[in-house]
Amino acid sequence: DYNFSTKNLMALVVPAGDYDKERAILDELEQYDEVDSTLGLSNVEAMGGYMLTDRLTPRQFSELTDLDYEVAEFLYGAYAANHENYGKIVGGLSTYSVPLIDMFLFLYDEVQQGYVTLDDELQSTLDDAYTQMTNAKLQLQSEQYSRMLIYSTLPVSGDETYAFTDTVTAIAQKYYPGEKVYLAGDSTNEYEFEKSFA
């Protein structure tokens, strides 16, 4: 049973744009006994066993979505051109990999603009995926920042909790040296309050 009253939720906010760093942070945090669970774009399953931010090649995307391989390859070429990654177009798209969420959102835009037409079943799958992925992105990422949720087993306040908030911040700083990272939640509020009166 999931009981919200027993969970201590913290939100770790880091610069957006590097799904690999976000996954590494979440993987590292999951190793701590103080962490019950984590949630971020990189550990949300999308479909077919893939996480939202897993990088897929055109072949993998084609197999996952039942999209013709030639259409998937065209789509990846358009994505590469759109992101001015011309070397991938010239060098071959077969090994080019793009995060699943980014490719789905790009495909949705291409369909909306009339560049790609899908059969009804695939269109329905795309519409459902688009709704779920945009909701996840709205909750966990903005233009400048990504948010990762950490559900801790520790109480909201106390020395052990405060030490762990420092650990979480240090882990994030290791992946984003010299950049702003933020940790928010009741524990950090309590910690700041206690430090101000120390």
Regions found by a protein language model. Give the residues of each.
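Extracytoplasmic
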Residues: 20, 87, 91-198
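Low-complexity, compositionally biased segments
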Residues: 69-71, 85, 130
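Short secondary-structure transition/capping segments
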Residues: 53-60, 83-97
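Juxtamembrane segments of multi-pass membrane proteins
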Residues: 1-81
